[in-house]
């Protein structure tokens, strides 16, 4: 192609010609080869002009190579339709985007059925997603133009779909619209766009948050049609058309859970019930959510009228104490990120992590809620517009506005680039340095270091401004002359406690009097008592910020009573307000951790380590810490006690990080497993040396510890025991040990295993290391404690039940010599990859039924055993591995999520099923991690404290607990349906 022809193909206004900036390549040769291989398969009449355009525009060429290297999602869009790519590159993106929306609207208007509408909308989504991504990557559009385009796409999708559905209803005679071409007008059906969609700030792979209302006297409804069933059916159709996953993808995931009381209300609500709810029961988060609400589809006039009626709920006229308490409520949602002294770039969540997008949004929304009632100009939806008005009204400095605005735009670009990789609604940077290096190049940086420098600067800046907003004591109570020892007769003290938010001031005052009188063991030392008395005012104000202040006082009182020594603890708390906040959270939400702290106050040392809020330690760092802990132990008993203390501290620190939201539950699971694995290996070595010193060795002896269950799959919780199997081998010709007290083969290893179990389970003042369960060994309780390798192999090959092979999919050798490890892994792989008939589904179904009979499956919050719970997902993953491993050994994985990913990738699990099972497993795991940490018995929502419910809501990424419970129920139903279809069962 000649240069003039190329120039003619590329107008100055085209996307290709305007491609000014772009990514950098991580592996240039490989990226270039991927593009070349792709173009080699493209018809010549398309490949030549694409190649010519790319050669004419070097930035574009590099960007296409980077997409091939870093973004499977975008590269799939490119490969799916080369003609579409060429058309986008040659056209002006602004007019092309508008033309795409118009053409889609016209196609939907003439569509004959729902299937055609779904296909048309998905073609629009694919083209828009590619076009918007290229405009973002190439620097054609600033981030606010990108978010507006994404929002326009979502709004148009909702409007087109709703119009199609209402036209169908009109054709059936159920509504009589005055304008058949626009049946939504005067329909009484209101669709509110919430969150980022309402503000024109939608992110690249975002869900769309909608609330649907209807007027009971909807004027176009036929007289014989009941409003609620009709509008619920339309809403369900809207959701189905937009989010149902098909071979050609989906349009938008739809979230309807921001409506009032979603667990017990239909997906469409009457405006009368909505107004009644917001007036009587509306909560702080709902006020904040309504700041961004916008009538986006349906009867927009009625929607705007509804928002006007809701406005008094959102915008309060007076800044009374209750309003200030609401503001602190919002602050506490972000409180979990206070106290972080460093940010770990790897694995950082740019939305809700320290210094992230959410802090900027809360910074603006908090002040909007405070002042928006008296200053209507603050009632704006976009975050940056709110910051601008706050600066103009002297609520914040212009420097703060500029810095927060710059950070917001930078972090939104990071968020988009993360989501472009795989079209997933994630906000978290990769976990490894190498992966962040690749991401940095995709984002346009020359190195991870350069990207990290800018990222950290923005995060630190945001956190600084956010923290300053809440400095000082907004209630003014700190200046009052309070006698904290005054007791229940002191009216000034009682008034002060009420003002702080205590509901039982008499009880709190009596407790304070006991504290100040030094009646507890740790307060007998005068210096400690004096330090504590000075600390009480700050303590009582900090505990007042708990969700249940009175319970927090009781929990701290129990801690004081249980402490044998505590001067250093009180000193630490009195000098570190953030540490006190963290301890208040622990005491309020996780009494189990509070009891641990009372028994071993020294485990708090880890909380003041500057690295505590940084990246989770890897195995190498854990090994170094463990070695340092044990370095000068003087005896076997002291060695084990130090191990117990190390284990207790590790559990406490990881648990505290879960509660504070500074580590994901997935990261916590791996951390729990890494700690356990390090301890198991250490105990194995220690017991081996001690045992050999007594009984000697058997020639060529080997021992290995095989981890099963949650340790094997690296999915541990704070309450997990250790499922272990000990496997051994030795020279058959010389079966006796060579020590002074010689033992014969099997007896030697049985006694060794007993010694090992004792080291784990013996309780001392430092607690126990772990509870150990060895029932997964061959023949269970009826079999020997330890298994010789050839006996283990024979049992698995000949005698093992199907359930034992299911369990074996999680088996992982965690302590052994490299040679013995390899032999065991070979045996396990041979067992798992032998041919099996799909008829083993009957065995799996019978096992599931037996478990249900024994454990029950009707408790929604028994996340493991409930119908559609984690056991169902585990069985699906394990069943698919057993059935297909013979022909597809790559399906094998010890972790459930990895097994699901493998099964989907290999085509033995339908992608829609995988798309249900993955988030279900993550949800169950996230919630289980919290429940195991905080609840020692069955979880009962009706008796659970607000602190725990709040942590669960955050873990489940829900607006409130009722929404979370609704999501759990819905998820269990979906999982059980898949289980029944793949494996069988009645689903009861």
Swiss-Prot record:
It comes from Rhodopseudomonas palustris (strain HaA2). Residues 1-474 are annotated as: Adenylyl removase. It comes from the Bacteria. PANTHER family: BIFUNCTIONAL GLUTAMINE SYNTHETASE ADENYLYLTRANSFERASE_ADENYLYL-REMOVING ENZYME (PTHR30621:SF0), GLUTAMINE SYNTHETASE ADENYLYLTRANSFERASE (PTHR30621). InterPro entries: GlnE, GlnE_rpt_dom, NT_sf, PII_UdlTrfase/GS_AdlTrfase. GO terms for molecular function: [glutamate-ammonia-ligase] adenylyltransferase activity; [glutamine synthetase]-adenylyl-L-tyrosine phosphorylase activity; ATP binding; magnesium ion binding. Its cofactor is Mg(2+). Keywords: ATP-binding, Magnesium, Multifunctional enzyme, Nucleotide-binding, Nucleotidyltransferase, Transferase. GO terms for biological process: regulation of glutamine family amino acid metabolic process. It catalyses: [glutamine synthetase]-O(4)-(5'-adenylyl)-L-tyrosine + phosphate = [glutamine synthetase]-L-tyrosine + ADP; [glutamine synthetase]-L-tyrosine + ATP = [glutamine synthetase]-O(4)-(5'-adenylyl)-L-tyrosine + diphosphate. NCBIfam families: PRK11072.1 (NF008292), PRK14108.1 (NF010706). Residues 480-988 are annotated as: Adenylyl transferase. This is Bifunctional glutamine synthetase adenylyltransferase/adenylyl-removing enzyme. Coiled coil: none annotated. Involved in the regulation of glutamine synthetase GlnA, a key enzyme in the process to assimilate ammonia. When cellular nitrogen levels are high, the C-terminal adenylyl transferase (AT) inactivates GlnA by covalent transfer of an adenylyl group from ATP to specific tyrosine residue of GlnA, thus reducing its activity. Conversely, when nitrogen levels are low, the N-terminal adenylyl removase (AR) activates GlnA by removing the adenylyl group by phosphorolysis, increasing its activity. It is an enzyme of class 2 (transferase). The keyword Nucleotidyltransferase applies.
